[in-house]
Each structure stands twice: as C-alpha cells, then as structure tokens.
Amino acid sequence: MEFRGHDEPVDEMGVAYGRTPPSSSSSPAASASAGNGAGAAEVRYHECLRNHAAAMGGHVVDGCREFMPMPGDAADALKCAACGCHRSFHRKDDGQQQQQLRLLIPSPPTPRVPLLMPPPQPQPHPHPQHPYLHPPFPYHHTPSGSGGTTTESSSEERGPPSSSAAAAQGRRKRFRTKFTPEQKEQMLAFAERVGWRMQKQDEALVEQFCAQVGVRRQVFKVWMHNNKSSIGSSSGGGSRRQPQEQQSQQQQQQQ
C-alpha cells in the first residue's frame, strides 16, 4: 500500500534545519560598541595643567606629562597614578584639534604670471662733492674813507669754519686781510702811542680807534703782534701817552 499526501515539506516550516536565523538586534549593538571603543581609543589625556600655586598668585605645575589611570574602581580610574590629580586637569586630545588645524591652514597662493615690463633705465649717480673743491671765501675788504689802492699785509684773520671744512678733519681756513696805506699809517701811529700793547685800561680807546679806521679789534691785535718785532723795534718802541691825551686827540681829529 502506498500512502501519499502525508509527507510535509521542509520549506513550509519557515526555518531550514542546520541554519541560524540572523539576529537583527545583535548587529546594531556590536556596531555601537565598536564605535564607542574606537572613540575612546582616540581620546588621550596629556600633561597636567593644574596650578599648585594659584592661592599665592603664582603658576606652578607638577610636571606630569601624561595621564595614567590609577588601578581600582571607576572613581579611582579618573585619578592619575603619577600626580594624583583628576583627569579633568590633564589636557584632553580628542584628535579633532589636528583636523581643525588642517582646516585653518590657508592654501598656498597661486603663482601669478609676472608682467613683461621693460627693464628700468639706469639713473646717473651724482658725483660726490669733495670738500676741498669748494671755492674759497672772498677776501675781506675793509671800508676806507679816503680811497686808494689796497696792499696785502702780513696779518692773517681766522674766519669762521665752513661746514665742509669742519667735516674735512676739522681744519680751519685762514684768510688774509688787506689794508690801505692810510689804514697802515694810522695803525702804526696808534700802536706807537699805546706802546705796541693792548691793556685793559685802553679797551675803550682801542674800540673807538678800530671803529674809526674800519678794522676789527682782533685784526688790529694780530697786525700789531706781527709787526711789533720789525716796525716796533726800529722805532724804539715809541712813547706811550696817557689814555686821556689819546682820547682828546681822537676827538680833535673827528672835529
């Protein structure tokens, strides 16, 4: 006898023998745990930033360079085994700082094509002026009331140093003064009267004579010093009169 229709197909049960149905709840949990583990591995705590001298107004750190969790329960694991400080005092590095730095770094500028410009023309350099090439100062001419030709005397006058002479080794330039024959005669006569010397008591008389002749006091003093040995010795030094008599003679000459 054959019995048909009593065999049940295996596929109708919905589950095949020897196969394990996939678990929908296990994969998200595994992926979440894997994600948390990867995130925890990226976070690192570096040197300790705790200020141990904050109460005194200073700044002192303990020198701990990296956080090491203390063995024990969860509360002890938040303390550093090296310095004993809480993990919050250590600098946290979650790996995002380097990524932010990469974003903040500007991109290198694009090179620009230089414009084809003509080469600049060389400019002529000014020739440096030598201090000795400056023209000398003109001769000092003294005014003369009677006129006549001027003769060069042996007296020398020290003029004010120019800027170029001061820059060139600080040398002073000496200038010769020219006198007329009338000026020389008057200076010779006055020098014989005062004895070829200038004394303090004759300063007013000397100033008056220099203003009358048109010669500066320093110039007359140098001239008298240069000609004292030659002219003064030949004339015997002259006879020196009193200042009152000299003033009276000068007043008479002016009248």
Swiss-Prot record:
The record, for Pfam families, names:
ZF-HD_dimer (PF04770)
Site annotation (Required for DNA-binding) points to M224
Entry protein name: Zinc-finger homeodomain protein 6
Q: Which gene encodes it?
A: ZHD6
What organism is this sequence from? Oryza sativa subsp. japonica
ZnF (ZF-HD dimerization-type) ranges:
45-93
Cell compartment(s), UniProt: Nucleus
Q: Which domain of life is it from?
A: Eukaryota
Alphabetically sorted, this entry's keywords are: DNA-binding, Homeobox, Metal-binding, Nucleus, Transcription, Transcription regulation, Zinc, Zinc-finger
